[in-house]
Amino acid sequence: AGAGQGEVGVAPPSPARGMVYVWPMAAAETPAETFKRALANAARALAEQAELEVHFGSDGPRLSNGVLTLPHPPRDPGAPESATLRGQADRLALRLANHDERLNARLRPVDQTAAEVFDAVEQARVEAVGARELKGVRNNLNAALLTRLEKSGALRAEAERVPVAEAAALLVRERLTGEAAPDGAKTMLD
């Protein structure tokens, strides 16, 4: 069936009722555009912010002034990079839903190393909230974690050279979720 002939899209949840509405998809929507729309709507739902602005650009992933910016998705939404992108979106959406910036600023240590550990542990805490309850979110977060650790070089570092903040976050994540570190990251804790 062509667009408008049985194909549907999903709208963000209604803040008043928490419901999702359905509307016809645009005729020319590509799989990448469908993926972007689904990813943005999932981030809004996870963040519990129906009006959350989600942008795609080369400067993502980041959260700034209430705007979630994500990297452009791969052309093939089934590509392994898609799980990483979903994890990046979930990570930031969970931060919006479960992080108190004022409290964090008040409690954050002044010492740089202590502040890095504090920030990493706080991010592990907010991610654990979603990972404990939602298997898909847990899988996405694991994919994003492994990609982030690989890009930072932490997976290739000897145990004594792993950044203390990364190791602390992995330990807190394990404690809060009951899930061992992903296979690629276990050597960081040896």
Across the structure, where does each feature detected by a protein language model lie?
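Glycine-biased, low-complexity coil/linker segments
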Residues: 1-6, 17-18
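Compositionally biased, low-complexity segments
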Residues: 8-10
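Intrinsically disordered, low-complexity segments enriched in serine/proline and basic residues
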Residues: 12-15
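Basic/hydrophobic alpha-helical interface regions
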Residues: 20-190
